[in-house]
């Protein structure tokens, strides 16, 4: 459609990020149509049709200085963003415009951010495991290639650091393309991530889309869809793509803000009434088809450490693996602070991961569960009152707990110890030795912040 043929309307009301625009009655824009402001780069997205030619839109950008009577043009199509190889190595905003000052993105292909999820008969479930090199994840909640993973945790327990380490280990080993969507997170983290990718020479395989904390709610709500659209394009070209989202909770929160601005009645805890539908629309599109796969890792902030909050609770149902980060474990100084009793994966099945891996995982969890049950008795009566087999279980559990810690590559600057990548075979061998009692003679400090079990033996020699 040429610019001359665009239907014009006028702004009739501005309330924060919500703008009402009046069009001729017979040329009323459709829901999700993108409207552009004359003489400015501001884009509005139609959310509601109020009747009499008036539509209610959400502003994708700062609405400062807007006034009634300003001319608005209807593009006649939804927001479209550039996709494909020209987006790699670039930082873009919600509209796919470059924000890295490295010139325009010369992509011939653009794609609307609102797409239908693949049909059921196109889906392709996978049982192939994706090795992360992080012991606790590979053992307790292994990831499936083409699966969906959630990193759940409250404020400051290490979601972003865990995600950075996963990107570091998977994106570098994986060799394929990755898309990172920064949804409502800190600008500093986005900057750190960009330089991390640049320094490790994988920037040319990553497309970065940011709608950070300082952006209006419209941007934060749509930026996840922008990133997903880019990932879908690579998948539909037959590639295996990694899709990272930090943070899904901010997507929900932006939806809450927009919903309130649009005048919808809030539901439980003040969330939007359409929470499940909005989450479903996003999550159903993050999926693997017979053409290609999307493996997604999503950080999910847990408000007030309450996993029953509607936002994280709605996300749980869509995931194949959940990695739950615990404040109690973080307070012990054990990082990554993954809770081995709360975290789970659909891949924990002897037919998928093999009998040995399955039995070791369950053995580790049983030992830790026994320790958890005995902690109250120990706190009141002390270790001496325990039966000999319980003392042994506690000693092994404390070694397992420490062996689940691991130095990260991305945290080297803070910890001073070099990061470790532990292959799955080594992880299983190490935990098997602890569970079967082959390490009972070693002190528990030897297991803290090491990679393989051999390093624990070396450390024990130094301690003794």
UniProtKB/Swiss-Prot annotation:
F-type ATPases have 2 components, CF(1) - the catalytic core - and CF(0) - the membrane proton channel. CF(1) has five subunits: alpha(3), beta(3), gamma(1), delta(1), epsilon(1). CF(0) has three main subunits: a(1), b(2) and c(9-12). The alpha and beta chains form an alternating ring which encloses part of the gamma chain. CF(1) is attached to CF(0) by a central stalk formed by the gamma and epsilon chains, while a peripheral stalk is formed by the delta and b chains. It is an enzyme of class 7 (translocase). The keyword Transport applies. The gene is atpD2. SUPFAM superfamilies: C-terminal domain of alpha and beta subunits of F1 ATP synthase, N-terminal domain of alpha and beta subunits of F1 ATP synthase, P-loop containing nucleoside triphosphate hydrolases. The keyword Cell inner membrane applies. ATP binds at residues 153-160. It catalyses: ATP + H2O + 4 H(+)(in) = ADP + phosphate + 5 H(+)(out). It is a peripheral membrane protein. PANTHER family: ATP SYNTHASE, ATP SYNTHASE SUBUNIT BETA, MITOCHONDRIAL. Its EC number is 7.1.2.2. It is found in: Cell inner membrane. InterPro entries: AAA+_ATPase (IPR003593), ATP-synt_VA_C (IPR055190), ATP_synth_F1_bsu (IPR005722), ATPase_a/bsu_AS (IPR020003), ATPase_alpha/beta_chains (IPR050053), ATPase_F1/V1/A1_a/bsu_N (IPR004100), ATPase_F1/V1/A1_a/bsu_N_sf (IPR036121), ATPase_F1/V1/A1_a/bsu_nucl-bd (IPR000194). Belongs to the ATPase alpha/beta chains family. This is ATP synthase subunit beta 2. GO terms for molecular function: ATP binding; ATP hydrolysis activity; proton-transporting ATP synthase activity, rotational mechanism. Produces ATP from ADP in the presence of a proton gradient across the membrane. The catalytic sites are hosted primarily by the beta subunits. GO terms for cellular component: plasma membrane; proton-transporting ATP synthase complex.
């Amino acid at each position: 459609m040429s610019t001359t043929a665009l239907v014009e309307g006028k702004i009739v009301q501005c309330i924060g990020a919500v703008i009402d625009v009046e069009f001729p009655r017979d040329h009323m824009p459709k829901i999700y149509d993108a409207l552009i402001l004359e003489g400015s780069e501001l884009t509005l997205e139609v959310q509601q049709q109020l009747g009499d030619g008036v539509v209610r839109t959400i502003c994708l950008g700062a609405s400062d200085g807007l006034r009634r009577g300003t001319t608005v043009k209807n593009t006649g199509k939804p927001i479209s963003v550039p996709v494909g190889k020209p987006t790699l190595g670039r930082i873009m905003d919600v509209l796919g415009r470059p924000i890295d000052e490295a010139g325009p993105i010369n992509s011939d292909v653009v794609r609307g951010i609102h797409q239908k999820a693949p049909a059921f008969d196109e889906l392709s479930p996978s049982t192939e495991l994706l090795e992360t090199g992080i012991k606790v994840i590979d053992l307790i909640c292994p990831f499936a290639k083409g699966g969906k993973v959630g990193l759940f945790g409250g404020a400051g327990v290490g979601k972003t650091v865990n995600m950075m380490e996963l990107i570091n280990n998977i994106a570098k080993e994986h060799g394929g393309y990755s898309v990172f969507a920064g949804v409502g997170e800190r600008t500093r983290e986005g900057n750190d991530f960009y330089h991390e990718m640049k320094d490790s020479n994988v920037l040319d395989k990553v497309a970065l889309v940011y709608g950070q904390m300082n952006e209006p709610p419209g941007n934060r709500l749509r930026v996840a869809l922008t990133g997903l659209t880019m990932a879908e394009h690579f998948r539909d070209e037959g590639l295996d793509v990694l899709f990272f989202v930090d943070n899904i909770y901010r997507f929900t929160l932006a939806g809450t803000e927009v919903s309130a601005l649009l005048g919808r009645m809030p539901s439980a805890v003040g969330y939007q009434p359409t929470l499940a539908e909005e989450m479903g629309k996003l999550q159903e599109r993050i999926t693997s088809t017979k053409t290609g796969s999307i493996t997604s890792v999503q950080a999910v902030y847990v408000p007030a450490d309450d996993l029953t909050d509607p936002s994280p609770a709605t996300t749980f149902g869509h995931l194949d693996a959940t990695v739950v980060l615990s404040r109690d474990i973080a307070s012990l100084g054990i990082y990554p602070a993954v809770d081995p009793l709360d975290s789970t994966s659909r891949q924990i099945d002897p037919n998928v991961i093999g009998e040995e891996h399955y039995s070791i995982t369950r053995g580790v969890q049983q030992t830790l569960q026994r320790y958890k049950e005995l902690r109250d008795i120990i706190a009141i009566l002390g270790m001496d009152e325990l039966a000999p087999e319980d003392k042994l279980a506690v000693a092994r559990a404390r070694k397992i707990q420490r062996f689940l810690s691991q130095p990260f590559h991305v945290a080297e600057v803070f910890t001073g110890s070099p990061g470790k990548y532990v292959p799955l075979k080594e992880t299983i061998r190490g935990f098997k030795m602890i569970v079967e009692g082959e390490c009972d003679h070693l002190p528990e400090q030897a297991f803290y912040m090491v990679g393989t079990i051999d390093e624990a033996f070396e450390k024990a020699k130094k301690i003794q």
